[in-house]
């Protein structure tokens, strides 16, 4: 008998639907009272501790989710990814970001070729170049050391590396290696972003890394041309070859741009942008800032989770458990969002990165076979470090919409502070909130409890917390390069699990194309209006025509053929 075309047509899905009503009637207060249940919902790998006992789920729920995974052929799909099968079917590509952090002696194939040697050729090239840039044997056009780096890219070429950079900045080993150096990321085509990035920097000591696989990405290449002008206007056109390098596979365009093709670092079609932080996209700028040895530890951390994900049984497999719980929360309990709440300021850029990884991967309305999905899939991801988020949006999480939460804590702070006479140290104060918030969400506070506290009758409705709000807790032992790599890989694989179960293609992103193609039409109109004085006429609806006309009239002082003007800040 043929497999159902949609996962929602399977017996396991229908069984979970039937099971749902009983779970909805059971409060987390009751579920949390079962010690045996709680103990069964705790998993540890390599000192990473996952507690998902505060999910609206019983052991029976979890068993049924395993059956759903089996009917979705989850293990086979994971194996197909690792084997280099073209699981990105709409673009006919392998999905092999795991190869980017594989050990040198590994064998991972795409189209019959072991890609690991190519990966390590690029890593060795990055190590050599970053070592030379850091020790002063590669210098700028005027002989000065290149201590400042601007990485130019957008989307996955920016969010992932920025997350890792921000997390490493306060790590003792990494920060020591980065002393006297600066790494910035230019992503937005907004000239304000250019101004902020070059502010306070000297072209003589700045190296620009242009990240674009095809070297045609509109925003990235305009920003790259802007920085090329910034360098050449200060140091002369010949300086570009000393101050700009590329992460790209289009060597002819790299050379035409003025960058020496020998200073281009490759990556491959089997690397999706949002999964590219472990390629030259992230490894090159991060190695220039922190040294290759630190970044290699980051890669090793990601690799450790890759091995865990591919080999651990589902009951002990952290990414699989997280992915299945997300499917349960989204498609069965009907919760559309997820809050990512790291209790570490070093992880402040985790949520924006995972927002892209998750929402660009799983924000799909059709199955991998093109069938409309009759169920909800994908999550709205957002987050903020604790305790800042508590003073921002936790109000809604506690007393408004139900939003499942990921609490991420770190046992040992990167930068401990101790003050004599304080009741607890700064990190203990932070972690007090990490431990308290999940219970507040789960248990809530009843009107009866408030009455016992002599709360005024008219305030009781306002101070009541319904509880029964699901969360999970991840406790990391430390936050060094290795653990940052592990955390990244956990979330990458969690997202893949969700997509595999939902039966969607988590590795394409056709949704970004339509807006870009329409922007081409607008760009042509802006050029025609500025240069030829043509009014906004054909091809636009009334609303867009009105907005465009208003914009052009208000910026009529912009010259048709302006002289070069760079930000002055």
UniProtKB/Swiss-Prot annotation:
Keyword GTP-binding annotated: no
GO biological process annotation, one example: gluconeogenesis
Active-site residues (renumbered): 360, 391, 516
The UniProt record lists the keyword Hydrolase: no
CDD domains: SIS_PGI_1, SIS_PGI_2
Protein keywords: Cytoplasm, Gluconeogenesis, Glycolysis, Isomerase
Pfam families in UniProt: PGI
Top enzyme category: isomerase
Primary location class: cytoplasm
EC assignment: 5.3.1.9
Bilayer-crossing regions: none
Cellular component terms per the entry's GO annotation: cytosol
Pathway entry: Carbohydrate degradation; glycolysis; D-glyceraldehyde 3-phosphate and glycerone phosphate from D-glucose: step 2/4
Any one Gene Ontology molecular-function term assigned to this protein's record: carbohydrate derivative binding
SUPFAM superfamilies registered for this protein in UniProt: SIS domain
Gene3D superfamilies: 1.10.1390.10, Glucose-6-phosphate isomerase like protein, domain 1
InterPro entries assigned: G6P_Isomerase (IPR001672), G6P_Isomerase_C (IPR023096), Phosphoglucose_isomerase_CS (IPR018189), SIS_dom_sf (IPR046348), SIS_PGI_1 (IPR035476), SIS_PGI_2 (IPR035482)
Localisation per UniProt entry: Cytoplasm
Protein family: Belongs to the GPI family.
Subunit (UniProt): Homodimer.
Protein name listed in UniProt: Glucose-6-phosphate isomerase, cytosolic 1
Classification of source organism: Eukaryota, Viridiplantae, Streptophyta, Embryophyta, Tracheophyta
């Amino acid at each position: 008998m043929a497999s159902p075309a949609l996962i929602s047509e399977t017996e396991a899905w229908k069984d979970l639907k039937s099971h749902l009503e009983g779970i909805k009637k059971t409060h987390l207060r009751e579920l949390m009272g079962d010690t045996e249940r709680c103990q069964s919902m705790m998993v540890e790998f390599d000192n990473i501790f996952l507690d998902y006992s505060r999910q609206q789920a019983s052991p029976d729920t979890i068993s049924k989710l395993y059956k759903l995974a089996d009917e979705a052929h989850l293990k086979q799909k994971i194996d197909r990814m690792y084997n280099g099968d073209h699981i990105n079917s709409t673009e006919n590509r392998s999905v092999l970001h795991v190869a980017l952090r594989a050990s040198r002696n590994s064998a991972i194939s795409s189209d019959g070729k072991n890609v690991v040697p190519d990966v390590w050729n690029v890593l060795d090239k990055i190590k050599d170049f970053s070592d030379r840039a850091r020790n002063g044997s590669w210098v700028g056009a005027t002989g000065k050391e290149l201590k400042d780096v601007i990485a130019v890219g957008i989307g996955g070429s920016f969010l992932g590396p920025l997350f890792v950079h921000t997390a490493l900045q306060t790590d003792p080993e990494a920060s020591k290696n980065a002393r006297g150096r600066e790494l910035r990321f230019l992503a937005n085509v907004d000239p304000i972003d250019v101004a902020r990035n070059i502010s306070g920097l000297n072209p003589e000591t700045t190296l620009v890394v242009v990240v674009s696989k095809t070297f045609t990405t509109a925003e990235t290449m305009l920003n790259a041309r802007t920085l090329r002008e910034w360098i050449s206007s200060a140091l002369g056109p010949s300086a570009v070859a000393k101050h700009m390098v590329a992460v790209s596979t289009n060597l002819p365009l790299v050379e035409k741009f003025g960058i020496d093709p020998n200073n281009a670092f490759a990556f491959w079609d089997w690397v999706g942008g949002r999964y590219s932080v472990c390629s030259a996209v992230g490894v090159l700028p991060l190695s220039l800032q922190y040294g290759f040895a630190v970044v290699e530890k980051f890669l090793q951390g990601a690799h450790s989770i890759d091995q865990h994900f591919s080999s651990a049984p589902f009951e002990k497999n952290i990414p699989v458990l997280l992915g299945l719980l997300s499917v349960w929360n989204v498609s069965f309990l009907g919760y559309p969002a997820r809050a990512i709440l790291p209790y570490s300021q070093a992880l402040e850029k985790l949520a924006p990165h995972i927002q892209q990884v998750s929402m660009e991967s799983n924000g799909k309305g059709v199955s991998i076979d093109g069938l409309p999905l009759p169920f909800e899939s994908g999550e709205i991801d957002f987050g903020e470090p604790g305790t800042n988020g508590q003073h921002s949006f936790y109000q809604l999480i506690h007393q408004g919409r139900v939003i499942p939460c990921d609490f991420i804590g770190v046992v040992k702070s990167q930068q401990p502070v101790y003050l004599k006479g304080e009741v607890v140290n700064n990190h203990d104060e932070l972690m007090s909130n990490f431990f308290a918030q999940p219970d507040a969400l789960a248990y809530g506070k009843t009107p009866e409890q408030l009455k016992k506290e002599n709360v005024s009758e008219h305030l009781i409705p306002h101070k009541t917390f319904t509880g029964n709000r699901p969360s999970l807790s991840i406790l990391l032992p430390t936050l060094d390069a290795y653990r940052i790599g592990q955390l990244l890989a956990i979330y990458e694989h969690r997202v893949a699990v969700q997509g595999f179960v939902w039966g969607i293609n988590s590795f394409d992103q056709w949704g970004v194309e339509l807006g870009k193609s329409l922007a081409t039409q607008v760009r042509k109109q802006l050029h025609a209006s500025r240069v030829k004085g043509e009014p906004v006429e054909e091809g636009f609806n009334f609303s867009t025509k009105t907005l465009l006309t208003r914009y052009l009239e208000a910026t009529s002082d912009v010259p048709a053929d302006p002289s070069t003007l760079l930000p002055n800040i």
